[in-house]
Amino acid sequence: VGYFIGLLLSIGSVMLGESEGLVNDLMGIGIYGLLSIVLLNLSLIINDKIILSKFDIKKEIFDDKNVGTGVVEGSNAIATGLVVMGAITGEGYGEAGPIVNVLIYWILGQIILFVTSKIYNLITSYDIHDYIERGNIAVAVGYSGAIIAIGNLINNSLAHDFDSWMITFQDVGFNVIVGFAFLPIARLLTD
């Protein structure tokens, strides 16, 4: 379900602006839809190999029926869908072109989601990977909330008209720093 939500967010973002005619709109949906599918799948591979590398996600989901791992996998797809949505939504792009902008934003988003994962694990009194592997759904939901929240902050930072890379990185940096500052506060309030 998370994968399809991420896909809807990213592909649906093509239709948020004004119409450029039926043919151009369909071409945009096709190009960005294909790009979204590729980026979502790459994100899941990154999630498997880098972010949650302490256990085998496919084994946890398919063999062990670990709901918590499925929740985390879905939240990664939703967060990535939000990042791609923000990247596609804004008008204008740098000299490199719109596809390169989306790719740079996606890479930036993946780095931030990785850092979020590390910070979240540091601010908890337990190893989230261990508890997720053991099937603790509450830990998975808490972690997923953080990942999706940061993905939403990235989305809001990117979903504006492109002025310059400096302004974009400042917007993303400010929002992410605020998000990182609130992560421990949210953990404290919910615990």
Explain the meaning of each model-derived region.
Residues 34-53, 107-124, 181-191:
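Membrane-water interface of transmembrane alpha-helices
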Residues 20-39, 43-73, 89, 95-100:
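Membrane-interface helix-loop-helix junctions at boundaries between adjacent transmembrane segments
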Residues 45, 68, 138, 165-180, ...:
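Alpha-helical membrane-protein topology signature
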Residues 11-24, 83-97, 122-128, 152-170:
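Transmembrane helix-loop junctions in multi-pass membrane proteins
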Residues 102-103, 107-119, 131-162, 166, ...:
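A contiguous, surface-oriented mixed alpha/beta subdomain in the mid-to-C-terminal portion of proteins
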Residues 24-41, 94-112, 167-182:
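Alpha-helical transmembrane segments
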